[in-house]
Amino acid sequence: MNDDSETPGAEAWMALPLFNRKASPDHEQNVLTWFECWRPPEDDVSDFKSLEDYEDSPTHSIGSSGLHSGSLDSDYHYYTASDLVFSDDGGVGRNADLLSEISDDHIPQLSFSTPSTCPFPGCKSTALFTTGRDFRRHYRQHFKRFFCRYEECSQSTNDPGDAGKKGFATRKDRARHEAKHNPAIRCQWRDNNGDQCTRTFSRMDNMRDHFRRIHGKE
């Protein structure tokens, strides 16, 4: 058999770029990186009230992260609350180590036949969840995979001794935080000479609040 022969599609497969960790903006800053080997099933858009909810959903947020194509649905398993084995020391395991590998793409699928509380160990929330959307949004806050990309920021690294208190659950939360390092929204108020207010803000609502409180009486 000729060594140069290739099966159909092999050349195209070989041309696919490998995932470049160094080029990734989240290099060495994602607590739970094992999900790079998995491709979760797509959510039905009808499960979400708005496009924003869909884009922020746990499974959809990694759709363009360079995962290899191909379905692994036969190997994919949604963990249920019964899979979480709570230990006396406050830890949790799926026969010991579930949380060491679980990502926010593997969230307990509660039945919601009755209002349910969060099963995450140590969760202090008293909220009762009646829909999967609200529960998923809450539950993934326990897994903060994104960290500030400004090195001097206290939110830029994950401190094992302070787990769960640093970082952000979604890219949107991180982007909102990072905007504070480089506020670019300038107050639009001008005085009688046409000179503009010098205050800048990272959020439009904060600028409007400033405008209303400070300049509204002028």
From Swiss-Prot:
Record bears the keyword Transcription regulation: yes
Protein species of origin: Trichoderma arundinaceum
MF (Gene Ontology): zinc ion binding
GO CC aspect terms: nucleus
Subcellular location: Nucleus
Top-rank taxon, per record: Eukaryota
Function: Transcriptional activator of part of the trichothecene biosynthesis cluster that mediates the production of the antimicrobial trichothecene harzianum A (HA) that plays a role in Botrytis cinerea antagonistic activity and plant defense priming. Regulates expression of both trichothecene and mevalonate pathway genes.
Keywords in alphabetical order: Metal-binding, Nucleus, Transcription, Transcription regulation, Zinc, Zinc-finger
Summary of the knockout phenotype: Blocks harzianum A production and reduces expression of the trichothecene biosynthesis genes, as well as of mevalonate biosynthetic genes required for synthesis of farnesyl diphosphate (FPP), the primary metabolite that feeds into trichothecene biosynthesis. Leads to increased expression of 10 of 49 secondary metabolite (SM) biosynthetic gene clusters in T.arundinaceum and reduced expression of 5 SM biosynthetic gene clusters.
Name of this chain's protein: Trichothecene biosynthesis transcription regulator TRI6
Zinc finger feature spans (C2H2-type): 185-215
